[in-house]
Amino acid sequence: MVTTMKEVAERAGVSKSTVSQFLQKRYNYMSENTKKKIEQAIEDLSYIPNEVARSLKQKKTFIVGVISSTILSRFTTEVVRAIEDECQLENVQVIVCNTDDDSLKEKKYVQSMIARQVDGLIIFPTEENKKLYVSLVKNGYPFVFVDRKIDELSVDTVLLNNEKASRACVEALIEHGHNNIGIITFPLGKKAITTRSERLSGYRNTLGKHDIPVNENYIKSGRLDEMPNLIGQLFHMENPPTAIIATNDMILEQVLIYAKNNHLTIPNDFSLIGIDDVSFASFYNPPITTVSQPSFEMGKRSARLLLEKIDQKEQDHEELSEIIRMNPVINHRESVLKLN
């Protein structure tokens, strides 16, 4: 059931007119204490302002929003391009917002797009905004997740079979005689993004399947600006890994830059596999073994799901959501050395 302004006012202990003034950002005669009470009531009740709720019932704007994690990634760029191509077939325009995986920016962009009355959203989500997405589901707002999922939330999602992707990397390295395998990922933590946690899980499980102990020192995670130091830590170990898995295209670039700056050769000094088939991988010297994601198909499928949701006159929120897993493909090249 949709939360009303009256319920917010009652929770905050103020009048409806005061809540209305707050929503219109008219704070001239409003104390900080009152503002905090209203903010907390809105958060507790997952309230969507009436003016936004009304927009959900208005005519289509033929505009959708894409809340992207980072436009620096080739994978993300390809997904967004495919979304745009698919939407153009229906004369629907696309607005793209870049969050840099900042949950606060993500929340602001989602709220801004809804306030602008876009017909729906395709989102690269973070776990921190789960409560926001729960409220959107309750209010019947059309949206789809891509690349990541949020557990215990019924939302149509299109993403890679991430465990299968990292499993393919580890299997290929083991087949070439490697047991000391390092892996580098962006930040993990308790609320790790799906791609990161699942790829690490695939790495761990595959080593376990082959009775190879997991060396926690071979697992490095951090921000992009921390990569040179993290990569250096691997190579300065007493027993460094003979092979490294870069879990996305941006990390792969950082490993290649480190190797060049430190006069390390691939695959003689270390073997390398990257998840995401970057454009230069096939003609790099040596050509880099990669795992491809069907990025264009993922973008196309997520756009089609959203457009279908928008066209539906009634939403059945009790219906189970559809989780679509796309299969990765490994591209064997020349960056993995065969050990004796």
Swiss-Prot record:
Keyword Transcription attributed: yes
DNA-binding region(s) in UniProt: 5-24
InterPro entries (UniProt xref): Cro/C1-type_HTH, HTH_LacI, LacI/GalR-like_sensor, Lambda_DNA-bd_dom_sf, Peripla_BP_I
Highest rank taxon of the organism: Bacteria
Domain HTH lacI-type, first and last residues per copy: 1-58
Assigned keywords, A-Z: DNA-binding, Repressor, Transcription, Transcription regulation
UniProt GO molecular function: DNA-binding transcription factor activity; transcription cis-regulatory region binding
A Pfam family of this chain: Peripla_BP_3
Gene3D superfamilies membership: 3.40.50.2300, lambda repressor-like DNA-binding domains (1.10.260.40)
Functional note: Putative repressor of the endoglucanase operon.
Protein's recorded name: Probable HTH-type transcriptional regulator EndR
Phylogenetic lineage: Bacteria, Bacillati, Bacillota, Bacilli, Bacillales
